């Protein structure tokens, strides 16, 4: 039983109170340590290991990450990452970092710095030590006493995330643009290639780069054209050339014969003709050029496509030769009374299929007698009626081709001029013996 406080003297009262306090103290209070331990944020004291250990906020904080984000614990904190993000732990096999010692001594340096061995404050590289809160899509840049989260080139920050910039919206490319994550690529249409700035397109000269043209190549903007030499035409494939058969287009290209050749054609003439102005055929006058084989006793007569050697003296009894082409029947010869007084030899040539009627030869009287009348007729050589005589006047007449004739062919026509004088009872005749050569062609 404790003594009554009012009955005790003052000194005894103080001792009694002291004993009462000491006697009521708990045995546990006497076992408390005389110091305490404090850990930094994200860590808690582990009494067993006597060190600070990491707090797994993903387990201790309800709904630490919202929405479709997943919680990733790390030393001293946690991260909220997309569920598709991959996390590589212990990349170098070094194991977890050593336990953080108790923060018994405060950091004497300003935020973002830490003391070194010489007690100097050095910058903390938050990026290298993973002490930043930059998103996986961001780049961490260390700064003196701090750090900065930036977006890579080709990205821009929208909210907390870096989003790809669609550069194609800004028409950086001249032709086509392909957007890429963080970048873009320009492409050109066929026939163009990227210029030095990788944005503009310049024309490709396909002709200098081995375009598949068989003959001629013409470069144009963005493409090329194949062309062929004269005498060729472009094939359906647009590259190769095929010969044009000009001879098959028309039968009038050449006067005689058309010969097709690669890329061209040529005209040929028959024997006895020569080419004139590349397409026409002209008769070769062998008599004038000396390209004949007539003897001195013969006369060379040219006709279309050839020549004929005739005897210089063509007079037959009772006629005698009085000049190169004229034969005379003497009046003193009784055999000449019923014959033409003279025969003159002439030669001419015409082409085949000549248009009719056609004037081919004119007969002219060489002598005119007063009161005489001249009549002209075909005496011989016109059995088929291919010719007829049209008298022009008293002294001349025209030999007319009545029907088209085809050569090679030869006519010998005796064209007779009969001279009559009724007052003097005079009648005489003379013959022009005309040899008509019909050429084998229409030229």
From Swiss-Prot:
Glycosylation sites: 198, 394
Taxon lineage: Eukaryota, Metazoa, Chordata, Craniata, Vertebrata
Xref: CDD domains: EGF_CA
Signal peptide: 1-23
Record PTM text: N-glycosylated; contains mostly complex-type glycans. Not O-glycosylated. Cleaved by ELANE; produces a 50-55 kDa fragment. Cleaved by MMP2 and MMP9; produces several fragments.
Alphabetic keyword roster: Basement membrane, Calcium, Disease variant, Disulfide bond, EGF-like domain, Extracellular matrix, Glycoprotein, Repeat, Secreted, Signal
Locations listed in the record: Secreted, Extracellular space, Extracellular matrix; Secreted, Extracellular space, Extracellular matrix, Basement membrane
Effect of residue 267 to Y: In ARCL1B; loss of protein expression in patient dermal fibroblasts; increased transforming growth factor beta receptor signaling pathway in patient fibroblasts; loss of protein expression; strongly decreased secretion
Disease implicated: Cutis laxa, autosomal recessive, 1B: A connective tissue disorder characterized by loose, hyperextensible skin with decreased resilience and elasticity leading to a premature aged appearance. Face, hands, feet, joints, and torso may be differentially affected. The clinical spectrum of autosomal recessive cutis laxa is highly heterogeneous with respect to organ involvement and severity. ARCL1B features include emphysema, lethal pulmonary artery occlusion, aortic aneurysm, cardiopulmonary insufficiency, birth fractures, arachnodactyly, and fragility of blood vessels.
Self-association state and partner proteins as the record states: Homodimer; disulfide-linked. Multimer; allows heparin binding. Monomer. Interacts with FBN1 (via N-terminal domain); this interaction inhibits EFEMP2 binding to LOX and ELN. Interacts with LOX (via propeptide); this interaction is strong and facilitates formation of ternary complexes with ELN during elastic fiber assembly; this interaction limits interaction of EFEMP2 with FBLN5. Interacts with PITX2. Interacts with ELN with moderate affinity; this interaction regulates ELN self-assembly maturation stage. Interacts with FBLN5 with moderate affinity.
Name of encoding gene: EFEMP2
One protein family per Pfam: cEGF
GO annotations of cellular component type: basement membrane; collagen-containing extracellular matrix; elastic fiber; extracellular exosome; extracellular matrix; extracellular region; extracellular vesicle; microfibril
Chief subcellular location: secreted
Keyword match DNA-binding: no
Gene Ontology molecular function, alphabetical: calcium ion binding; extracellular matrix structural constituent; heparin binding; protein homodimerization activity
Record-given protein name: EGF-containing fibulin-like extracellular matrix protein 2
Origin species: Homo sapiens
Source taxon at top rank: Eukaryota
Family note: Belongs to the fibulin family.
The EGF-like domain, residue ranges: 36-81, 123-163, 164-202, 203-242, 243-282, 283-328
């Amino acid at each position: 039983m404790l003594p009554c406080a009012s009955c005790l003297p003052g000194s005894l009262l103080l001792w009694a109170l002291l004993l009462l306090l000491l006697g009521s103290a708990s045995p546990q209070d006497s076992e408390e340590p005389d110091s305490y331990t404090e850990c930094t944020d994200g860590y808690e004291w582990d009494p067993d290991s006597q060190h600070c250990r990491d707090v797994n906020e993903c387990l201790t904080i309800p709904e630490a990450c919202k929405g479709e984000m997943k919680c990733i614990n790390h030393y001293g904190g946690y991260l909220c990452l997309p569920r598709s993000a991959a996390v590589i732990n212990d990349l170098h096999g070094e194991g977890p970092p050593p336990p953080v010692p108790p923060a018994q001594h405060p950091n004497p340096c300003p935020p973002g710095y830490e003391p070194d061995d010489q007690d100097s404050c050095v910058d903390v590289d938050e990026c290298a030590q993973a002490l930043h809160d930059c998103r996986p899509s961001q780049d961490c840049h260390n700064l003196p006493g701090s750090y900065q989260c930036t977006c890579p080139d080709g990205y821009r920050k929208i909210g907390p995330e870096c989003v790809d910039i669609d550069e194609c919206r800004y028409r950086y490319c001249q032709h086509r643009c392909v957007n890429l994550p963080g970048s873009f690529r320009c492409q050109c249409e066929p026939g163009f290639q990227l210029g030095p700035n990788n944005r503009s397109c310049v024309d490709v000269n396909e002709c200098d780069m081995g375009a598949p043209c068989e003959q001629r190549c013409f470069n144009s903007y963005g493409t090329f054209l194949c062309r062929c030499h004269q005498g060729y035409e472009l094939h359906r494939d647009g590259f190769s050339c095929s010969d044009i058969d000009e001879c098959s287009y028309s039968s009038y290209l050449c006067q005689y014969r058309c010969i097709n050749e690669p890329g061209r054609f040529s005209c040929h003439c028959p024997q006895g003709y020569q080419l004139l102005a590349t397409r026409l055929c002209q008769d070769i006058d062998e008599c004038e050029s000396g390209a004949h084989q007539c003897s001195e006793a013969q006369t060379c007569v040219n006709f279309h496509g050839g020549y004929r050697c005739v005897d210089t003296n063509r007079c037959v009894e009772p006629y005698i030769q009085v000049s190169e082409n004229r034969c005379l029947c003497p009046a003193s010869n009784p055999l000449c009374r019923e014959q033409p007084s003279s025969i003159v030899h002439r030669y001419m040539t015409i082409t085949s299929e000549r248009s009719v009627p056609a004037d081919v030869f004119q007969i002219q009287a060489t002598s005119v007698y007063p009161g005489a009348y001249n009549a002209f007729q075909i005496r011989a050589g016109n059995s088929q009626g291919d010719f007829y005589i049209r008298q022009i006047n008293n002294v001349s007449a025209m030999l007319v081709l009545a029907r088209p004739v085809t050569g090679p062919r030869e006519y010998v026509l005796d064209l007779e001029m009969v001279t009559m004088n009724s007052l003097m009872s005079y009648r005489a005749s003379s013959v022009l013996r005309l040899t008509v050569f019909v050429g084998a062609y229409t030229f």
